[in-house]
Design a protein with these regions (language model features):
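Glycine-rich, proline-tolerant flexible connector loops at the mouths of alpha/beta enzymes
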Residues: 108-124
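N-terminal small/glycine-rich loop or linker at the start of catalytic domains
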Residues: 63-81, 135-148, 177
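N-terminal secretory signal peptides
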Residues: 1-18
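Structural preference for beta-strand elements that scaffold enzyme active sites
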Residues: 67-71, 105, 131-135, 172-175, ...
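N-terminal twin-arginine translocation
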Residues: 16-21, 32-52
């Protein structure tokens, strides 16, 4: 790993108050995306109150993927990092409400929960899987349901992807990220494994999170 790589930990409850508040509000008002409000009480009752078609008809290019200009990051819907985790019964309608308002790009990760976030997102997106772009992330190992360090060995990546595909109820992940660099595994090994998964149809593209330009160039050289 390059000396310039930063290894920011996945945030927990001791994150800054302003960021915690932002993420809490995002989970509560996710379907509205600034166009309406979803109250705590309405979420608890399984209903949403929001209006407007915030991004319908608009799009951006992300490589050869076409996505809405606003995506929905689903982390705080279940992880408890910035607010108490919520149930699939509460969050599936929020995700589907975002779809109704033109959002087509959704982000999750195996570490969110862990695992429960992908279950929620998979359930919500299953009816419209071919109409949306799905991003998820890997790169950690787990012990008794808790994050226990990083692991991006090729065998670990392959095992993680099989679990992700099952939880997300899909046969491919459109954008597959390495969540954090594993200092014990050359990034070339990661890129090579991701490239194999793309060739096998289990992923369409891969990305790297929080890496230096040097690390990014090494990965790109291995699998452009």
């Amino acid at each position: 790993m390059s000396a310039n790589d930063k290894s920011t930990p996945i945030p927990h409850d001791n994150a800054g108050t302003s960021r915690r508040s932002f993420m809490r509000n995002l989970a509560i008002a996710g379907a509205g995306i600034g166009a309406g409000l979803v109250s705590q009480s309405s979420l608890a009752s399984g209903s949403t109150v929001c209006a407007g078609n915030v991004v319908s008809g608009q799009s951006r290019k992300l490589g050869d993927l076409t996505v809405s200009p606003i995506g929905l990051g689903c982390m705080s819907m279940s992880s408890g990092s910035y607010n108490p985790p919520r149930s699939a019964k509460e969050m599936v309608p929020v995700i589907r409400g975002a779809i109704d308002r033109g959002v087509t790009f959704f982000d999750t990760a195996e570490v969110y929960g862990p695992f429960t976030n992908e279950l929620i997102v998979g359930e919500a997106l299953k009816p419209v899987r071919d109409q949306v772009v799905l991003a998820s992330k890997l790169g950690f190992k787990f012990d008794n349901g808790q994050r226990a360090g990083r692991d991006s060995r090729p065998v670990a990546i392959r095992k993680a992807v099989e679990g992700m595909l099952k939880r997300l109820q899909t046969d491919r992940i459109d954008l597959l990220y390495l969540h954090r660099v594993d200092p014990n595994v050359p990034v070339e090994d990661v890129a090579g494994t991701m490239g194999e998964l793309i060739k096998e149809g289990k992923a369409r593209h891969f990305g790297l999170s929080e890496v230096s330009p040097t690390t990014l160039r090494k990965a790109h050289k291995e699998y452009p």
